[in-house]
Amino acid sequence: MAELEFEKPVVELRNKIRELKEYTKHSQMDFSEEIRILEDKLENLEEEIYGNMKVWDRVQIARHAERPTTLDYIEHLFTDFFECHGDRFFGDDAAIVGGIAKYNGMPVTVIGHQRGKDTKENIRRNFGMPHPEGYRKALRLMKQAEKFNRPIICFIDTKGAYPGKAAEERGQSEAIARNLFEMAGLTVPVICIVIGEGGSGGALGLGVGDYIYMLENSTYSVISPEGAATILWKDATKARDAAEALKITAADLKELGVIDEIIPESRGGAHRNILKQSENINVVLQKTFEQLSGISKDELIEKRYEKYMKIGQVSFSNASIWVK
């Protein structure tokens, strides 16, 4: 498993314990007490490092090469998944996957960004950066879900929409804007979960819903830290400072009222235990569907509208405003 810079002390101690256990198997000496001491030390070290992570540490975890993807969660949370392809205008975009599935026996539509697990797959999926046809495919599936009264679950995990010339020529901005407009008025429940990086408009194209959740170590921002640093300071190496300033973590966005709830992760990140992470997501999904049950279509749209109108409101209760 790939290690991140800030967690090297944990990895080194974990490896030392594993080596000692392996040596014990082939030795007549008893190292059980030494192993116990090291395991206690590891527990304290993990609590210290993972319990005091900086924003940049969370950015690294959100980008981890082994972090679970949309298809991983589909496999663990849903049954009878049938993937649908194509936008019926131009083509199919592998950077967004979507289809019909069952959640606890209930028909649902599942859509999400999909990055690759290796170089070959990343190239095929364009590193999880969708083209316009990806967003149009997603919208086609959303409208289909609305027609057949299926709830929609969106998994968000992208650095951003692909900014290439061909994507712009095929209407990248229009495709994203159309999704925002249409998702706001869907008459079926929409649940959005940021599972990795939530980058700019590319994330928003799947991010308008009745409930917005973020995994504990995911990020959600208008621009990448590197991009912000380049614009503000003409220096991409100041990405750490930009990450702090952007307020991109789940805790920041919960405090700002942008998201509804934080889904906890296993210590060290979701990639450490995908089964446990899927269980954590499942708990939230079950609770959310209970909250959404019995709500009429008109009330659903009204509550969604009110939700987004509250985001970004500024209180002037302690300030004087002079208008000339």
From Swiss-Prot:
Start and end residues of each CoA carboxyltransferase C-terminal domain: 37-291
Keyword Aminoacyl-tRNA synthetase: no
InterPro entries named in the record: Acetyl_CoA_COase_a_su (IPR001095), ClpP/crotonase-like_dom_sf (IPR029045), COA_CT_C (IPR011763)
Record-linked PROSITE patterns: COA_CT_CTER
Subcellular location: Cytoplasm
One example of a Gene Ontology biological process annotation: fatty acid biosynthetic process
Pathway recorded for this protein: Lipid metabolism; malonyl-CoA biosynthesis; malonyl-CoA from acetyl-CoA: step 1/1
One term of GO molecular function: carboxyl- or carbamoyltransferase activity
Its EC number(s): 2.1.3.15
Gene Ontology cellular component terms for the protein in this record: acetyl-CoA carboxylase complex
Entry keyword annotation includes Plastid: no
Predominant location category: cytoplasm
Alphabetized UniProt keyword annotations: ATP-binding, Cytoplasm, Fatty acid biosynthesis, Fatty acid metabolism, Lipid biosynthesis, Lipid metabolism, Nucleotide-binding, Transferase
Functional summary from the UniProt entry: Component of the acetyl coenzyme A carboxylase (ACC) complex. First, biotin carboxylase catalyzes the carboxylation of biotin on its carrier protein (BCCP) and then the CO(2) group is transferred by the carboxyltransferase to acetyl-CoA to form malonyl-CoA.
Record family assignment: Belongs to the AccA family.
Subunit structure: Acetyl-CoA carboxylase is a heterohexamer composed of biotin carboxyl carrier protein (AccB), biotin carboxylase (AccC) and two subunits each of ACCase subunit alpha (AccA) and ACCase subunit beta (AccD).
Protein name per UniProt: Acetyl-coenzyme A carboxylase carboxyl transferase subunit alpha
Organism encoding this protein: Bacillus cytotoxicus (strain DSM 22905 / CIP 110041 / 391-98 / NVH 391-98)
Name of the gene: accA
